[in-house]
Amino acid sequence: MAHRFPALTQEQKKELSEIAQSIVANGKGILAADESVGTMGNRLQRIKVENTEENRRQFREILFSVDSSINQSIGGVILFHETLYQKDSQGKLFRNILKEKGIVVGIKLDQGGAPLAGTNKETTIQGLDGLSERCAQYKKDGVDFGKWRAVLRIADQCPSSLAIQENANALARYASICQQNGLVPIVEPEVIPDGDHDLEHCQYVTEKVLAAAYKALNDHHVYLEGTLLKPNMVTAGHACTKKYTPEQVAMATVTALHRTVPAAVPGICFLSGGMSEEDATLNLNAINLCPLPKPWKLSFSYGRALQASALAAWGGKAANKEATQEAFMKRAVANHQAAKGQYVHTGSSGAASTQSLFTACYTY
C-alpha cells in the first residue's frame, strides 16, 4: 500500500508552475549558455580566439546586452557557474541584466559523467552530493531553474537497462531536490546522435528512455507541472546514410512524446544535438505542425544552434558587436516562429547557419 506524504506546499507548487510556464509562454524558448570552460574553449578555437575568462565574458556580454525585444523569443537562459557571477563592462551582473529583460535565469547543475562498470562505456551523471546546498545558494542568487543532462547512446548493447534506469533515477532525484529548493528542474535525458542507426531505431530507444524517466519522476514524487523536459529530437544517427525530411523527424518525435510524456508537463524544449542552426529550426517548425495531439508547448533549448552564426560574426573583435547581436537575434526570432509553427525558410541563411555542428560524444 502506497502512502503519500506531501513533498511540496501549495505555494511551492504555484511558484514552480508559474516559472515553468513563463519560460515557454507564447513561443519562447531557452538559450543554453552553460558551456563549460573547456567546451567554450573549443568554440573559441574554431574562430582563432584565445580561451580566456575575459574573452568568454566579452562574448556573453554581447549576447546578453542585445535589445530587450529578445524577451519575446527567449524566456530563459541557462548559465554556467562562472557566468552566473560575471559582470558586464559597467560592473553589472549578467544575471541582473537578464532579469531586467524579463528572462528567467537558470544554472547547469550536473557535474559530468562517471563510468558504469560492466557496460559498454556507458555513464551515469555526477552531482547529487551537495546538490541541495548548491540549489539553495543559487536560489538566493536569483536562479529559478536548473538543468541536468544524462547521456545515453545507441551502440552494441547500448543503451543497457542499467544505464537507462540509473540515469532515470539520477534525473528524478535531481528534480526532486531542485523543487524542494524552489528551482524548476529541466530534465534532459539525451539519446546522442552518434552512430549509424536509422530513425525507427532512435524512436524505439527514445521511447524507452523517456518512459523510464517519467516512471522515476513519479516514484520520486516530482511535481510535473513544475518541470520542463529537454529531450533529443528523434533523428537518425549522424553516420546513417539514409536521409529523412523534417516532417519524418517530426512525426517520429511527436509519436515518441505522445506515448511517454504526461500532459501535465507544461513544456518540451528540444536540444539541437549538433544539427545546423537551420536544420534545428526547420525540424522544430515541422514538429509544431505535426498533425498529432500536442498537449505541451513544444519549444527549444539551443546552445550551438543559437550561437554559431553569432560566434562567427564576432570573431573576437569588439567592432563586430552589432553584427554579432543581429546574427543572434535572427536565430532567436526564427526559433520563436518555429515554436509556433510559423517559420518560413527563405533560403538566405548564411554559411554558418547551414554548417553541421555535430561533435562526436559531445560534452558541455
UniProtKB/Swiss-Prot annotation:
GO biological process assignments: fructose metabolic process; gluconeogenesis; glycolytic process
Pathway where this protein functions: Carbohydrate degradation; glycolysis; D-glyceraldehyde 3-phosphate and glycerone phosphate from D-glucose: step 4/4; Carbohydrate biosynthesis; gluconeogenesis; Carbohydrate metabolism; fructose metabolism
Secretion signal, residue range per the UniProt entry: none
Localization of this protein: Cytoplasm, Cytosol; Cytoplasm, Cytoskeleton, Microtubule organizing center, Centrosome, Centriolar satellite
Residues carrying Phosphothreonine: T39, T119
GO CC terms of this entry: centriolar satellite; cytosol
Top-level taxon: Eukaryota
Binding site for beta-D-fructose 1,6-bisphosphate: R43, S272, G273, G274, R304
Keywords in alphabetical order: Acetylation, Cytoplasm, Cytoskeleton, Glycolysis, Lyase, Phosphoprotein, Schiff base
Top-level EC class as recorded in UniProt: lyase
Entry-annotated residues carrying N6-succinyllysine: K13, K121, K317
Residues the record lists as Phosphoserine modifications: S36, S89, S132, S272, S276, S299, S301, S309
GO MF annotations in UniProt: fructose-1-phosphate aldolase activity; fructose-bisphosphate aldolase activity
Pfam family, one: Glycolytic
NCBIfam families: FrucBisAld_I
Similarity-based family: Belongs to the class I fructose-bisphosphate aldolase family.
Note: In vertebrates, 3 forms of this ubiquitous glycolytic enzyme are found, aldolase A in muscle, aldolase B in liver and aldolase C in brain.
Name the UniProt record assigns to this protein: Fructose-bisphosphate aldolase B
